[in-house]
Amino acid sequence: MITNFFSVLTPFTFTSAISFNFPSFSSLEPNISFENAYANEDKVIQITGSKLTPWYHGRATYFRPMHLWDKGSKNLTDFATHFSFVIDSQNLSNYADGVAFFLAPNGSKIYRASNGSDLGLYNPALNSTENSFFAVEFDIWSNYQLDPPREHVGIDINSIISVANVSWLSNITIMEGNLNEAWINYNSSSQNLSVIFTGFKNNVTVNQSVLYCWFEKGPTWMG
């Protein structure tokens, strides 16, 4: 479940910057596109299954596309986002794959035939250039040959095999359905992508991080 969302996207001129803040959600919100997802009675976005609808995946995207990079100048866009979310296994040891923040080409749709490991983004029938997306995955299920053998946070670029990942101290938060937070920042000048997120160690919430130098160009407009 996504509980709140704040994002600032700063392209090449200040006047074209995009900023939005959602302290709560409604399924009637015109600025969010829901695919197999909805805002529940707690005013949070439900994007995976519940006891009534297991093995379910969905996603929610902001309606306005982001100018990710300029072909003429070769400039990339700075962006920063902060959101909070809950993954609740409902005290079950066999649970789903997790949740991801993503950027995908404008107009892209959820891949409905995907397995949980595909994040609703990756289509195994396509090649690496056709699978165009960026994602930060909060992965709680280890898929053989795709993931490290542990809960982890990974950075994905056009593939569900992460280019960088770090162990996520998340087991207690998953079993108890506790709140998690994440901050994702990209500085186009330094090409540094920073992901800071909360974990849980010795009954105390701790901050963890994963970094990556991202310079690859992709589609001009992302959503």
Residue positions per predicted region:
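Polar, low-complexity loop segments and adjacent catalytic/binding residues used for recognizing
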Residues: 1-223
